[in-house]
Amino acid sequence: MSNIAEVSRGGGHYGVDPWRQHIIKNRINADWWIRLDHWETLLADLRGVSFEVNSSRSQVADFINRVPKDLPAGVSVRFPGPRGNLGSTNYTEVYFVRIKSELKQKLLSLIAAADQGKNRDVEIGRPNAPVVSTGAGGNQAIVAQRGVNTVRDQQPLRDGSLHYRYLVQDIELAGAEQFDRALFEETFSLNWTVVAPPAGGGGGGAP
């Protein structure tokens, strides 16, 4: 589901020239726009990832990719406004978080960090490093020695986990801009022109 699919169309429009000048030319529509409640859920999901477990780590891309990110507005689609009646229990303000290129890159870096190689000893059961052991009577046997491969493989995983946590922290502290309808239209110098429906609702000719 896209953001714009949830927005009602018609009833008016923004000016075509201001839209081109302030939105298209400045690539505002190329930024990610995530509804505030979806953004808060995404951050909670990313914080909850157990990086050391591959099945949990592999969810990072899904968490990020499934969130609608398109600009919830168009020339003839007005940015979402509040829902319900002001002062009543059904009133809800609608905010979107704008994810610019720098913050977008950090989110994409989370996917890359989570895609690092598996801990091969723990997750695909690679045998332990064999060593030759000399027993009583001089008999020699090849036995597995725990720890050699484990240390080698788990250290990058620990480093990756630390890097992932720092990235999540940076994303949370970045303070992404929030927009409601009024802020969006004020910031990008857009005016919504109301267009009245055709007389009779456009349902045919005169009687």
Curated annotation (Swiss-Prot):
Work out whether the entry's keyword set contains Cell membrane: no
Function of the protein = Capsid protein self-assembles to form rod-shaped virions about 25 nm in diameter with a central canal enclosing the viral genomic RNA.
One cellular component (GO) term of this entry: helical viral capsid
Query: Known InterPro entries for this protein?
Result: TMV-like_coat, TMV-like_coat_sf
Name by which UniProt lists this protein: Capsid protein
Q: Which UniProt keywords are given for this protein, alphabetically ordered? A: Capsid protein, Helical capsid protein, Virion
- Per the record, the domain of life is Viruses
The record's principal subcellular location, in a coarse class, is: virion
Organism of derivation:
Peanut clump virus (isolate 87/TGTA2) (PCV)
**A Pfam family the protein falls into:** TMV_coat
Compartment(s) where it occurs, according to its Swiss-Prot or TrEMBL record: Virion
